[in-house]
Design a protein with these regions (language model features):
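Acidic/polar, glycine-enriched structural segments that form the non-catalytic walls/loops
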Residues: 1-237
Length: 237
């Protein structure tokens, strides 16, 4: 994305659950980044909204979308902040309701439950970031809250990362350890390594290049026949 001399590049690592945001300009500038979330509070599922989830047209009375956990914490980098966010499924999910509804509680323990203890989320982090507070707004008829960050000083280059992690764990602490391991891979010394990011970007580009090199569609159809007919008429054949 380019505008007024600023280039913003977003790319996802195909081998690791990390999204990178790179901002480049010919002159030093400050950059801001916001994490926006409409699930910052519990929300009762209203009539007709069951279609957004597995309950469909018959959600149990009182069913709600529970709030995500969102917390500001210190990064390993001096004076820098990062945002931890995640959603952990409630003790009872649609899996439990469906099993009971079908009268299968006796064999419930034998079933694979893909929703139990499932936690997903990540870190939003960057180089030399300061926290500038929250703001509330509305998008598509739904209110949301934004957590804002700004670079501590102007620079020609800025880099932000969103490190993600999804896992079924007995405790949140175990899930957080998995997330920290994923983050430490790109920040082995407590600071995001430009060398690691550069290597990951190169490998991602090579993967996409190989993908497109093996993805061809060759067609023979009406357009080609018309072109052949045109050539025949011009040559008098």
């Amino acid at each position: 994305i380019s505008a007024e001399g600023t280039q913003v590049q977003l790319w996802a690592d195909v081998f690791h659950p990390v999204v990178h945001i790179e901002v480049i300009n010919d002159r030093p500038l400050q950059a801001e980044i916001f994490y926006e979330n409409w699930r910052y509070q519990d929300r009762l599922i209203r009539k007709g909204e069951g279609q957004q989830c597995s309950y469909k047209w018959a959600p149990p009375k009182g069913t709600m979308t529970h709030a995500d956990f969102i917390s500001l914490e210190n990064s390993s980098e001096k004076d820098s902040k990062r945002l931890l966010f995640y959603h952990r499924n409630a003790e009872e999910t649609v899996f439990d309701v469906a099993v009971a509804q079908q009268g299968m509680n006796e064999v419930k323990s034998q079933m694979m439950n893909p929703l139990k203890n499932l936690t997903f989320g990540g870190y939003l982090s960057g180089e030399n970031l300061e926290y500038i507070g929250t703001s509330d707004s509305v998008y598509a008829g739904t209110d949301y809250r934004a957590w804002g960050f700004r670079s501590l000083k102007a620079s020609k280059k800025h880099h932000f990362s969103v490190v993600l992690h999804t896992e079924q764990t007995e405790t949140v602490t175990q899930w957080e350890q998995g997330l920290k391991t994923a983050w430490q891979r790109i920040a082995p010394q407590g600071k995001i390594s430009s060398k690691v990011v550069s290597q990951d970007k190169k490998q991602t580009r090579l993967w996409w290049n190989a993908f497109w090199q093996r993805s061809f569609i060759e067609t023979i159809g009406e357009t080609e026949n018309k072109e052949n007919s045109k050539v025949e008429k011009e040559t008098g054949n």
